[in-house]
């Protein structure tokens, strides 16, 4: 490995740090916007809760690393320099994209961003490699791209948008029927039931669904299930 790759590794480490700051800022906004806008509690307490949430989310997540490693493309089809170019392009694009969206106050997803950046960079490098090899045609790109896993991930992303919108609209409709605009006149037990259901659903999603695929899940699986 020559000097250019050493410099690229150093650049990747720096870019990863910057990307972490930008990405965490983006995720923190998802915690903060509703809480700050509604003035539910003091901003200081909101920041503490958001920090704890981002911290635990970071240490319990490993699925994204697996996607980056072999979820979108087949690493065996690429040389070391190809992988370096892919990740350099992904890191730079991710920083610029998330920073622009954060600056403009537009919603975005770090997961969706990284998936499509990996796919775009891998396809670009694959096309370059195919163009330099007369024995390969454009159809050979399916050897470079893990299209089954990539298609499943992209379909899941698109489906999650539809499901989230539909379920969210239904829950909002039901909550509006229950509370109308006179929630203070409703019996207190209704608030307790609705709040308990919401907290249970969120906790289930975080613990049961969120921890699956993490290195810690096997240790606590017997306690959960």
Please provide the spans of the model-predicted regions.
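Alpha-helical transmembrane segments and immediately membrane-proximal extracytoplasmic
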Residues: 1-225
């Amino acid at each position: 490995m020559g000097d250019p790759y050493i410099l690229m590794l150093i650049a990747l480490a720096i870019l990863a740090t910057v990307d972490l700051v930008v990405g965490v800022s983006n995720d923190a906004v998802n915690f903060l916007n509703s809480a700050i806008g509604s003035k539910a509690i003091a901003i200081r307490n909101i920041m503490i809760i958001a920090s704890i949430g981002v911290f635990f989310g970071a240490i319990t997540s490993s699925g994204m690393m697996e996607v980056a490693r072999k979820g979108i493309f087949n690493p065996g089809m690429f040389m070391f320099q190809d992988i370096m170019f892919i990740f350099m392009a992904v890191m730079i694009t991710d920083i610029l994209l998330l920073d622009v969206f954060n600056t403009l106050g537009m919603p975005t997803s770090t997961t969706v961003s990284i998936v499509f950046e990996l796919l775009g960079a891998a396809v670009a490098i694959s096309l370059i490699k195919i163009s330099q090899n007369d024995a390969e045609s454009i159809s050979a790109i399916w050897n470079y791209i893990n299209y089954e896993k990539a298609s499943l991930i992209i379909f899941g992303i698109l489906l999650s948008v539809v499901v989230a919108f539909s379920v969210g609209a239904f829950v909002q409709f039901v909550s509006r029927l229950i509370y109308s605009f006179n929630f203070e006149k409703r019996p207190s037990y209704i608030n307790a039931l609705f709040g308990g259901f919401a907290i249970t659903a969120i906790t289930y999603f975080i613990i049961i669904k969120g921890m699956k695929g993490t290195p810690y899940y096997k240790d606590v699986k017997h306690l959960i299930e």
